[in-house]
Amino acid sequence: MSKRTFKIVILPGDGIGPEVVAEATRVLEVVSASSSDVEIKLETHDFGGCSIDKHGEPLTAATLEACKLADAILLGAIGGPKWGVNSKVRPEQALLALRKALGLYANIRPANFASDSLLAYSPLKPSVARGVDIIVIRELIGGAYFGERKELGARAQEDAAWDTMIYSVPEVQRITRSRRQVASPDPPLPVHSIDKANVLASSRLWRKVATETIQNEFPQLKLDHHLVDSASMLIVANPKKLNGVILTENLFGDILSDESSVIPGSLGLLPSASLAARPLWPNTAHRRSSPRRVYEPIHGSAPDIAGQGIANPIGTILSAAMLCGTRSVWRSPAKAIEAAVEGARRQGDRREGLRTADLGGSSKTKDIGHKVVEILKATL
């Protein structure tokens, strides 16, 4: 029987993106080689700043079409000072356009410690950071980032600029229902909905709809509400109060997910996934049995260390594990990747040489990738 093909589009991006994605790609190649019934087909495309330099735009029609036809997408990182906020064309525009085109409405990002040995690298005191286990679910394609806007100097009122934050009942229902994408222990994780309902009309709608959706569809879940300014203080003062699932809109989620992600001490350690509800294209060429998803590490492009080979690839490798974990045929390889990462981490606890510079070590990006691949090959 011939192997089924699983197409993954690789978007290395900018800065350290190509370096960390290369190690995750090696891991996916090992998974493909070990499978008797599924073959992973990898296809690389320019995205972000490198696409601007080569093609004059951050997301070409060819790259977008490839992403639409893919089963999953693995992204490195985009951006850098070369394409600053005053540039007419910016790498971040590619990410927003991709999210909109693929219907990527929910971003899931964890913030936790793989080991207490990492507590020393947290910016918070160990007594405050120990035991933090937060998952941020952020709405991705609504709110101020996608509302009507006017730039300074454009049209009437040339001395003013604005952005509009709009949410509808279906949009809030959809992101609230995405809570089911997070595996729950027994008892289930509590949900902390974050808004600014004391000021914003869109937040009052958010709070009302989130409450009704949880009560009507997930009555077993414990739900509470926090104002965004209060939640941002809790994340640095007593983050364990927000253990569980943080559910919030686009702008607040952008800020809070970044704030919570630094608690574990290194942005290079954690993965994330952006989810679509269903395939969005009616024509046969774009049909898939499951919605597209984008997987990426939580860190940025880190241009200050790009090209030095010292970036931590663990977050990207774990993003590849998340990618595999969404397919029933690859649940076992996904767990094997996670176990290989844990094995490499344990060796790092004993030997500083298996830690990258962000964790006080001296190992290279490729050293970490090689060790993970070595352990994975022995397991699969």
UniProtKB/Swiss-Prot annotation:
Lineage: Eukaryota, Fungi, Dikarya, Basidiomycota, Agaricomycotina
Known cofactor(s): Mg(2+); Mn(2+)
PROSITE patterns (alphabetical): IDH_IMDH
Residues annotated to bind substrate: R99, R109, R138, D229
Keywords: Amino-acid biosynthesis, Branched-chain amino acid biosynthesis, Cytoplasm, Leucine biosynthesis, Magnesium, Manganese, Metal-binding, NAD, Oxidoreductase
Cofactor note: Binds 1 Mg(2+) or Mn(2+) ion per subunit.
Record-stated family: Belongs to the isocitrate and isopropylmalate dehydrogenases family.
NCBIfam families in the record: leuB (TIGR00169)
Key word Zinc-finger present: no
Primary gene name: LEU2
Stated name of the protein: 3-isopropylmalate dehydrogenase
Organism of this sequence: Phanerodontia chrysosporium (White-rot fungus)
Residues under site feature: Important for catalysis: Y145, K196
Compartments in which it is found: Cytoplasm
Residues annotated for NAD(+) binding in this entry: 80-92, 300-312
Amino acids binding Mg(2+): D229, D254, D258
